Structures are given as C-alpha cells and as structure tokens.
C-alpha cells in the first residue's frame, strides 16, 4: 500500500509492493526472504532464507496470512483467541499490540495499554519491539497483583493463585471453597444481600449545621430516588454535596475545607458501617460460611477464594475512579479466569480487549467453557478465534499429547 518517509530533501512518497528481511554480517549476506510480517525466530528466518523447499515457504506464507488477519483486525472490540500450544497465539497477540500502536499512534500510546499476565513473556518481547516504535514499555502485571492494589485500603494482603494451590496441596483435607465462591449461585446470593443493604445499612435522621437543617424525609427521598443510580456507599456523599450546595447558595459564600469535613461526617455517619471487610464478612455468615477474622486493617489477609468476591463487592458498593486511561487490555492465560473475574474486568475496563489462552493448559481440575460464557458477558462485541493448528511439534508428538489430554479439535 501507499507509504512515506522523511528524508533530508523532504517527505518521500511511494508504494510498498513487498517486504523483505535481511541479515548481513561482515559484508556477507547470511539470508534474505520475503515476508508480510516481521519474523523474530532465528531458526525460522534462516530456513526461509535458505534454498529450502518451496512447500515450507508456502506453508509459512499461509500461516502469516491467517495470523496477519488477526493482527490487523481493528473492527472487533473484544477479540478472544483460543490457541493450542504452538499455534502462534502469543506471537499474534504481541504483533497485534505493536500493530495497534503503529496503526492508531495518534490516539493509542504504550501508557494506554495494560497487560494482565502471570508471566513475563509479553514484557520481554515488548521491551525490544517498542523502542523501534518510539514507545515506552507497557504496564504488565498479574490480575492477582492488580486486585491486591485495588483492595489495599481494605486489607493488608491477599493470597494469590499459586499460594492457594500450594495451600491445597499441603492441606488436602481442608475443603476448598474457591469454586463455590466464584460460582453464579454465590454471586446471585451476593446481589440479593447487596439489595438488602439499601435498608439494613442505613440509619437516617435530621442533619443540623449551624442554622441550616436537612430533614430526614428529604434525605431519604434524595437517597432512594434522586441519587439511586450512585453505588450505595458513595450515595450519601452525593446527598451531603446537595446540602452543601444549598447552604453555600443561601449564605452566598463557599464552605472551607474544615466546614465541608464536618458536614460530610454528619451525613456519612448515617451508614451503620462503611467497612467493606466487615460487610463481606457479614455476607459470608448470612450464607452459612465462617466470617472473616475480626482483626485490624494491618492484620487482615484475604484468602484467594475471597479476593475477587470482595473486589466485585467493592465495585458494586463504591463509585470507582474509572480506568479510562487504559484503552486496550490484554488478558493472557484466559483459561484460568473465572466467570466472576471476567465480570469484574468488564466493570473495570470499558475498553477494547485482546483475550488469549489455551483451555488445555488450565490450572483447574477441569477446563472451563470460557469461549461459551464470554459472549454472555460481553455480548455481540466479541469475536472468537480458534487457532487449532500446532506448528511446534511433530504430528506424532501432537497426536500423543492430544490423546492424553482428551483433545479432539487440534491439528
């Protein structure tokens, strides 16, 4: 297609008819080959640059064509890639990030991308490719670390997935509640409990400040009607701001910070508690589970099975600072995320996503039907892609591995 570049004599325009990769050492051509996309595998580059079989080169070009269509897809908002081991899904996702940064460089910067991955494969690649695009490194972390950072004002520590697995192995007789607390039934019970909090958590009364009064009836009306769309634990703040606006209008001058704090405290004290840890513990007890230990903040540690239910509850009860700065989210190892975790991701990140993984590499006892429930969460915005051809192994090895894993849809 058409292209241009800056030169000392001005901008040069032309047409890119083909792309070639070269390796030259000490004035000697090591290899050269035509390629639609950048290839980083040294063995593959050497093979393509040799006088090898035409069939191999045709196969590689076919692979490139299929993968290139995924890399350059800018139409679908949520792209989900189920890829077998050796199918090239990680390479596709990496090149997709680079392509999107280049294609939409006016609106998308490396700071607008977040990668949730339990390993460093993405950052290793990106640290090499992004300098070529003039970009800084992209933020990458595990979802467990991200969740802990969101909850550090509620607890002092959170168990991660690997610690939870190790605990299960060391104490096999201890019942695991992870699946129960990630289930749809558990979430439905939580939603019912959150609805009941609308009344149970509140103790309404008149508010007086100097010569100004806000009657209980008016507070209730504002709380349950005018501001009903605001999350429960953030709603009274809106009611207080309404009162502050009225006072400032009537006396024709603004409150100072100390006055605002006094008024805000009067309104916020109508909550029986605002402690998310306490609220979740009471919810557990209402469901017949043991409550959380009654300890101070610095001693609070959540088990892994409770981390994401608490995070979900936080996003339902409190108005959150949105992550609008993140315009593209990459989720690696999608097979290890629960339905609840995807619901949280949808709430936290109203942006484009690339989600990838392999159901055969799950850490769970049995593979989840991630491709089945994701459309129910994200709706019609999702595009599912299955890469079931493995290019890493011989036919014999792949066939034997498929038999062991009970996989029938991988070539």
What kind of region is each of these model predictions?
Residues 115-116, 233, 387:
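Active-site-adjacent beta-strand anchor residues
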Residues 1, 134-202, 208-223, 227:
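Conserved P-loop NTPase-based nucleic-acid remodeling module centered on helicase motor cores
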Residues 51, 72, 76-85, 166-178, ...:
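Inter-lobe coupling/hinge region of RecA-like P-loop helicase motors
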Residues 106-107, 111, 120-136, 141-148, ...:
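Conserved helicase motor core of SF1/SF2 NTP-dependent helicases
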């Amino acid at each position: 297609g058409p292209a241009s570049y800056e030169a000392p004599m001005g901008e040069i325009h032309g047409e890119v008819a083909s792309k070639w990769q070269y390796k030259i050492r000490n004035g000697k051509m090591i290899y050269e080959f035509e390629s639609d996309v950048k290839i980083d595998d040294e063995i593959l580059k050497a093979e393509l640059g040799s006088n090898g079989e035409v069939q191999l080169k045709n196969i590689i070009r076919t692979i490139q064509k299929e993968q290139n269509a995924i890399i350059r897809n800018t139409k679908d908002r949520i792209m989900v890639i189920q890829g077998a081991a050796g199918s090239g899904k990680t390479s596709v996702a990496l090149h997709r990030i680079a392509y999107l940064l280049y294609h939409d460089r006016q609106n998308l910067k490396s700071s607008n991308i977040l990668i949730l991955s339990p390993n460093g494969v993405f950052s290793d690649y990106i640290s090499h490719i992004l300098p070529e695009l003039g970009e800084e490194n992209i933020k990458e972390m595990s979802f467990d670390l991200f969740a802990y950072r969101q909850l550090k004002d509620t607890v002092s520590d959170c168990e991660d997935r690997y610690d939870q697995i190790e605990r299960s192995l060391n104490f096999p007789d201890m019942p695991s509640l992870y699946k129960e607390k990630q289930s749809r039934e558990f979430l439905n019970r939580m939603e019912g409990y959150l609805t009941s909090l609308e009344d149970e958590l509140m103790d309404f009364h008149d508010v007086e400040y100097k010569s100004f009064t806000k009657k209980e009836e008016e507070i209730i009306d504002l709380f349950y009607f005018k501001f009903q769309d605001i999350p429960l634990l953030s709603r009274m703040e809106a009611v207080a701001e309404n009162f502050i606006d009225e006072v400032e209008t009537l006396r024709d001058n603004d409150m100072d910070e100390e006055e605002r704090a006094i008024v805000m405290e009067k309104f916020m004290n109508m909550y029986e508690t605002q402690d998310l840890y306490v609220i979740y513990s009471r919810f557990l007890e209402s469901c017949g589970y043991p409550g959380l230990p009654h300890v101070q903040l610095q001693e609070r540690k959540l088990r892994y099975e409770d981390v994401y239910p608490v995070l979900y509850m936080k996003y339902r009860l409190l108005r959150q600072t949105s992550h609008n700065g993140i315009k593209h989210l990459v989720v690696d190892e999608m097979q290890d995320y629960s339905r609840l975790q995807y619901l949280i991701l949808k709430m936290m990140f109203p942006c484009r996503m690339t989600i990838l993984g392999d159901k055969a590499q799950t850490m769970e006892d049995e593979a989840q039907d991630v491709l089945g429930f994701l459309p129910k969460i994200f709706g019609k915005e999702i595009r599912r892609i299955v890469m079931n051809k493995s290019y890493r192994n011989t036919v014999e090895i792949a066939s034997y591995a498929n038999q062991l894993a009970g996989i029938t849809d991988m070539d």
